[in-house]
């Protein structure tokens, strides 16, 4: 049994299989998951686990080169955005797109990780970097 790192077997498998430029979405309770895209449902109850808790574990284990966020988070959830931005290293490219575009982009991700987060626009697509 693993004693550290990502313990959820589905999420660990996705993380282990990521290649350069592969993408994973971490989303809130309400984010729709397109048909055919793997859904890893971590939600236990409203707010648990939080978006930030899941993001922390992901960032500890995966090299990220680019993230996509909904433009709407700036106006509708600035607190979440401020916390999120402190966690990204300076070399991570941040791209803002419309929420509708973000949902369309989810058709191409390796998985959508559903959290218990119940605040608006708490969704991020993380693009894997390469450790060379």
UniProtKB/Swiss-Prot annotation:
- SUPFAM superfamilies to which the protein is assigned, alphabetical: RbsD-like
Q: Tell me which Gene Ontology terms the entry assigns under biological process.
A: D-ribose catabolic process
According to its UniProt record, where is this protein mainly located?
Answer: cytoplasm
Function in brief: Catalyzes the interconversion of beta-pyran and beta-furan forms of D-ribose.
Active site (UniProt)? 20
**Annotated localization:** Cytoplasm
Pathway membership of this protein? Carbohydrate metabolism; D-ribose degradation; D-ribose 5-phosphate from beta-D-ribopyranose: step 1/2
Tell me what this protein is called. Answer: D-ribose pyranase
Its UniProt entry gives the catalysed reaction(s) as: beta-D-ribopyranose = beta-D-ribofuranose
- Give the matching Pfam families: RbsD_FucU (PF05025)
What gene makes this protein?
rbsD
Taxonomic source organism: Lactococcus lactis subsp. lactis (strain IL1403) (Streptococcus lactis)
What InterPro entries does the record point to? D-ribose_pyranase, RbsD-like_sf, RbsD_FucU
Q: Which PANTHER family does this UniProt record tie to the protein?
A: D-RIBOSE PYRANASE
Per UniProt, subunit arrangement is: Homodecamer.
Listed A to Z, the keywords are: Carbohydrate metabolism, Cytoplasm, Isomerase
Q: What is its EC number?
A: 5.4.99.62
Tell me the lineage of the source organism. Bacteria, Bacillati, Bacillota, Bacilli, Lactobacillales
Name the family the entry cites. Belongs to the RbsD / FucU family. RbsD subfamily.
MF GO annotations: D-ribose pyranase activity; intramolecular lyase activity; monosaccharide binding
